[in-house]
Regions:
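Active-site segments that bind and position negatively charged phosphate/pyrophosphate groups
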Residues: 1-84
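C-terminal charged capping/lid subdomain of soluble metabolic enzymes
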Residues: 54-142
């Protein structure tokens, strides 16, 4: 309904989809079997949910932070999302896709360039914080 109202996929396509699309393009370029879209989006959702929590935890200030943090409270915590994915038999680590650590870091760092939409990954890039959070993301989700 939100996409129909907006007239585009923006309401349902954030950083999680950008990560998925980045990886999709890599798998296609390597002529490898592309993991299911939902699997990649599920993993990207873990990253996004974690980043919103981490930014608020660290008190990162930016224009619109208060509204962003308030809206992000509607997203289930990443641990809860991970348990749900596990119950469904889905992976909760990007390494399950057979990708390297380097590709994981590249995908998370560059996925914001896939489409001209502002996401939590765009925010990290704009604030110069990507390298600060990349080790945490790698530890938790690779």
């Amino acid at each position: 309904l939100a996409m129909a109202e907006a007239g585009n996929s923006r309401p349902a396509s954030g950083a999680e989809h950008h990560i998925s699309h980045y990886l999709e393009m890599w798998f296609v370029a390597q002529k490898k079997r592309v993991p299911l879209h939902g699997i990649k989006v599920g993993l990207g959702t873990l990253v996004s949910a974690y980043l919103y929590e981490a930014l608020e935890r660290d008190g990162v200030a930016f224009r619109g932070a208060e509204e962003t943090y308030r809206a992000a409270k509607m997203i289930p915590p990443p641990d809860e999302l991970a348990r749900t994915l596990q119950r469904l038999g889905a992976p909760v680590r990007f390494s399950a896709l057979g990708i390297s650590r380097e590709l994981f870091r590249e995908a998370v760092s560059r996925a914001h360039t896939v489409r001209p939409r502002f996401t939590v990954l765009s925010l990290l890039d704009e604030l110069g914080l990507m390298q600060r959070y990349l080790p945490e993301l790698e530890e938790r989700f690779y």
